[in-house]
């Protein structure tokens, strides 16, 4: 008799990397009986469910199940953050969360004891049913505070937006919670409410946040999308935006206390997307000014995913007059030397924080320097000017701008990639590439056709773009050999008869 399912389980190394214990797992119920099999969900490793035994961790033989039916994953931003668990429907026949149909290709935040059904047969036809019960480790459940909204004085409803008490992020900026748009409800189909995010910031009285003002006018697939803003009587600003559930680039690269490199092809695709976003921003006379790994979000924690630029809290709108900026802002590790950070903090005492020590100021090319630092880290796992890790060391090294391509980490990196990094990390701003020149650099131009195929077909998942007419359905076979379409499946495999 053919087994109903098989499991490709997470390895011991995967679980140890997640802190020695899987933070959550799926309990598998196939054909109407509990298999007593659990599928661990560990940090930044996809758990795919479907019929494809080469790609899925839980392989089902039911013909009503799609090749890849749904995907689960976990995101940890850092040791102090609450782990987030997500499910995404990829099927033709539907995935149900607690009895409600999920929208295809949409991602939903999971909670303890959620029931996921991959097919909804009748009670008399249980053989067609596949149920997965999502269970969170007991030690993690207490991190969620169901009374958060009341404690913080947040509204529960703003126009058509319903704000939940489910946290997906918090920090000095404020809090990010899950919200639903009541206007999207379909009377004909009982869909699970789509998840969005609301960023809630405490403002000074009578001050509208410039981040919201900037984001409301932007519309680009690689920039966080904002739908609505509102300020309540307590001066809480609510920014309703897309939920980007794959974590940030920093946590994606983090392995323990270190950052790891990624393949050159994966780095190239991310750089291409960042350049698309920067080119759009700079054409709109907007400068991000805080581009770093933490502010680059992933839609899913896997190669070939869409990335999104976020956190425009210190972005600058130049108002089309091409003015230069003079404020010392940003993160020193990623900051261009002309911005004006000084290694000796006493030097700031005789100057206003609102004016750079370099009286000439700076322009949008400061974002390209930041991209150079990010690219250096992705290709090598090393921050180019980190030195001993102190702010003083970083600032001094950045002003010198010396790069060491003799490090062993550069051995497998192409000369074109090195040239790209070098051209972005020019201390002489005149010699540094701008966003348009970056897109024309040989590292990008040499692979432009392949990058566009990936960008429009895989990243945007649509048929837009001037060069798509020549793209065939077998685009995957035309990719560079180093492109990884899906995560490797652990070798350990268990089949239940």
Swiss-Prot record:
The active site is at 290 (proton acceptor). GO terms for molecular function: ATP binding; protein kinase activity; protein serine kinase activity; protein serine/threonine kinase activity. ATP binds at residues 168-176, 199. Its EC number is 2.7.11.1. Residues 162-444 form the Protein kinase domain. GO terms for cellular component: cytoplasm; nucleus. The keyword Oxidoreductase does not apply. Probable protein kinase required for meiotic recombination. Belongs to the protein kinase superfamily. CAMK Ser/Thr protein kinase family. CHEK2 subfamily. This is Meiosis-specific serine/threonine-protein kinase MEK1. It comes from Saccharomyces cerevisiae (strain ATCC 204508 / S288c) (Baker's yeast). The lineage of its organism: Eukaryota, Fungi, Dikarya, Ascomycota, Saccharomycotina. The gene is MEK1.
């Amino acid at each position: 008799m053919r087994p109903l399912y098989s499991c490709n389980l997470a390895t011991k190394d995967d679980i140890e990397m997640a802190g020695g214990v899987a933070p959550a797992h799926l309990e598998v119920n196939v054909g109407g009986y509990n298999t007593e099999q659990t599928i661990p969900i560990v940090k930044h490793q996809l758990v795919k469910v479907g019929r494809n035994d080469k790609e899925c961790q839980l392989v089902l033989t039911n013909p009503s199940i799609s090749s890849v039916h749904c995907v689960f994953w976990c995101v940890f931003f850092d040791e102090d953050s609450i782990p987030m668990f997500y499910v995404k429907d990829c099927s033709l026949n539907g995935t149900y969360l607690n009895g409600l149909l999920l929208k295809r290709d949409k991602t939903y935040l999971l909670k303890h004891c959620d029931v996921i059904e991959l097919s909804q047969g009748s009670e008399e036809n249980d053989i067609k049913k596949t149920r997965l019960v999502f269970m969170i480790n007991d030690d993690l459940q207490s991190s969620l505070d169901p009374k958060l909204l009341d404690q913080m004085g947040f509204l529960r409803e703003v126009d058509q937006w319903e704000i939940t008490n489910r946290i997906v992020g918090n920090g000095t900026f404020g809090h990010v919670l899950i919200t639903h748009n009541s206007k999207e409800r379909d009377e004909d189909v009982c869909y699970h409410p789509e998840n969005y995010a609301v960023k809630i910031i405490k403002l000074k009285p009578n001050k509208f946040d410039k981040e919201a003002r900037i984001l409301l006018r932007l519309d680009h697939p690689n920039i966080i999308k904002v739908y609505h803003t509102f300020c309540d009587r307590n001066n809480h600003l609510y920014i309703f935006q897309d939920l980007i559930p794959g974590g940030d680039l920093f946590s994606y690269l983090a392995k323990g206390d270190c950052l790891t490199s990624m393949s050159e092809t994966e780095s190239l695709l991310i750089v291409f997307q960042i350049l698309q976003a920067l080119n759009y921003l700079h054409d709109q006379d907007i400068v991000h000014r805080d581009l770093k790994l933490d502010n680059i979000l992933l839609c899913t924690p896997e190669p070939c995913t869409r990335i999104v630029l976020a956190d425009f809290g210190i972005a600058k709108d130049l108002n089309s007059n091409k003015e230069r900026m003079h404020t010392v802002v940003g993160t020193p590790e990623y900051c261009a030397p002309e911005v004006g950070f000084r290694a000796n903090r006493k030097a700031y005492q005789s100057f206003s924080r609102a004016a750079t020590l370099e009286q000439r100021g700076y322009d949008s090319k400061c974002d390209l320097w930041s991209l150079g630092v990010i690219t250096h880290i992705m290709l090598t796992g090393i921050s180019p000017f980190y030195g001993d890790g102190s702010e003083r060391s970083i600032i001094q090294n950045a002003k010198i701008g010396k790069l060491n391509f003799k490090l062993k980490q550069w051995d497998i990196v192409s000369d074109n990639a090195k040239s790209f990094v070098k051209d972005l990390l020019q201390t002489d701003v005149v010699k540094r590439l701008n966003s348009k020149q970056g897109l024309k650099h040989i590292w990008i131009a040499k692979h432009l056709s392949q990058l566009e195929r990936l960008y429009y077909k895989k990243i945007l998942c649509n048929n837009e773009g001037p060069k798509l007419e020549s793209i065939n359905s077998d685009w995957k076979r035309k990719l560079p050999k180093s492109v990884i379409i899906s995560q490797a499946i652990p070798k350990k495999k268990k089949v239940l008869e």
